Each structure stands twice: as C-alpha cells, then as structure tokens.
C-alpha cells in the first residue's frame, strides 16, 4: 500500500510516497501525486521521471520542468484541473524505461507499466476519489520516458493522449516504429525533438549505431531529428493524429521541453 507524505514545503498540493520495490529489478521507485487547488479535476496526467517535474533540488541533473506554475497557469486560463500521478526513475533506468530490449532480454519496462496500472494507479485514484472514466487521459515522458509514454498508451489505450518529448528512439529502434500500429486508433500523438540534442550521445553516432539503419548519420543532431521524424512519418502513414514540433535550438533537457509541453497541453 502506498503511503503519502509532504513532498516539499513550498508545494502544498504535491505528495510523495515511500519507496516502492520493483521486485523484478531489486530497485525502488516513488510515486508523486499532484492535485489542483480549488479546481475540479478535468485531466489526469501519468508522467515518468517524476523527480524532474517539480523541484530543481530533487532533479537528476539540475534541470526540471517547473511543472507546478505551468499547470497552475493553464488551470486558471483554461478552466482546467490537472491531477498528476508520476513515478520516479532509478539507477536501473535503462532497463526499466526501455520497452524494446534487444536479443530476447527481459522486458522490465512493460512489467513496470503493468504494476503502475494494475496495482498503484487504482489505489491512488481510490484514495483521492478520482473517477478515471470522466477525465481526459494523458501520458507523458521525455527521452526514455518518451518511449515509455508510447508503450503505455499501447498497453493501456484509454490513455490515448501521448506526449513524447525527444524520445530516445535508439534504445528501441526499430522496435518502437514497428509497434506503433498497435496504438489505439483514437490516439493523439504529440512528439517533439530539438535541433541541438547531439551531446546526449557522447560520441559520433557513426561509431555507436548500425550503419544500416535508415537514418541520417551526417551528424548527431541530424541523427536524432531523423529518428524522431521516422516515428512521426510512421504515425502519419498509419493514420494517427499527430502533432509534431521541431524546436529550433532545442536541447536535451527539461528547460527546453517546458514550452513544448505547454503547447501540447494546450491542445489537449
């Protein structure tokens, strides 16, 4: 059972659970819950990498979405109420957040998603008196969390509003592209990539990835863009509603993802 306590003294509408053991990995995650102040709940957001949402001090790399003022502003201007359920990542993130492992490796990501939806989300909704059937449902993530948001919607199609910010496609390429056909036909896919995300690779992509991938290997920035655009193209070919943002000068961190997220949320 999840037990929630104060997350941060400056954020009195956000609560954090105790660490929850992922028995498959032997590592832990926490759950954060954010509820709107003085607003009826109209939207639920399931988010990954919760540690990077609300607090710079609690973030992994010193960047964070600064999500509370973003949501509060939208709630006031658009008469909405966002209920957020978010799960933190851990030291096994590359296993727990990769729904497309290669060579028959165990799929820890799908097991993690299933534990969220089958065990923890129902308890949270019950504790906070949230009726999911009446809400607009969003799943969001960035980088590897962007892969998780896509896979989550495939496994739990009621969460049909997908926000995938700079998805780390190379962890699951071409599996993620081939899996898109399994999305709910009512899915709306919001995808973005920046033009300056090259540093995330740490080396020339020609030295890292198979050169027979049908992507642009001319430089690291173009490689990232071409991979995300490949997902976009496949979505469009399959007839899914797709919103795509190519962020000029956009880098691979939450500071740059924040305005893109706001634009996507406005459209949902």
Question: How would you describe each model-predicted region?
Answer:
Residues 1-268:
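Non-catalytic cap/lid and distal C-terminal segments of serine-dependent acyl enzymes
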């Amino acid at each position: 059972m999840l037990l929630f306590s104060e997350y941060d003294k400056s954020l009195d509408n956000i609560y954090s659970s105790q660490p929850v053991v992922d028995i498959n990995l032997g590592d832990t995650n926490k759950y954060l819950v954010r509820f709107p102040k003085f607003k009826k709940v109209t939207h639920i957001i399931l988010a990954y990498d919760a540690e990077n949402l609300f607090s710079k001090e609690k973030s992994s790399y010193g960047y964070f979405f600064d999500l509370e003022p973003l949501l509060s502003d939208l709630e006031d201007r658009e008469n909405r109420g966002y209920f957020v359920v978010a799960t933190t990542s851990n030291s096994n993130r590359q296993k727990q957040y990769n729904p497309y492992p290669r060579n028959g490796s165990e799929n820890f990501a799908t097991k993690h998603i299933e534990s969220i939806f089958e065990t923890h989300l129902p308890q949270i909704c019950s504790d906070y008196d949230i009726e999911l059937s009446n809400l607009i449902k969003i799943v969001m993530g960035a980088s590897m969390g962007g892969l998780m948001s896509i896979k989550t919607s495939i496994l739990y199609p009621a969460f049909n509003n997908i926000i995938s910010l700079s998805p780390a496609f190379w962890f699951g390429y071409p599996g993620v592209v081939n899996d898109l056909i399994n999305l709910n036909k009512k899915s709306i896919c919001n995808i973005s990539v920046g033009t300056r995300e090259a540093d995330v690779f740490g080396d020339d992509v020609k030295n890292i990835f198979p050169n027979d991938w049908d992507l642009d290997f001319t430089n690291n920035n173009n490689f990232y863009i071409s991979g995300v655009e490949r997902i976009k193209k496949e979505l469009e070919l399959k007839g899914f509603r797709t919103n795509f943002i190519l962020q000029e000068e956009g880098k691979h961190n939450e500071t740059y993802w924040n305005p893109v997220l706001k634009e996507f949320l406005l459209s949902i």
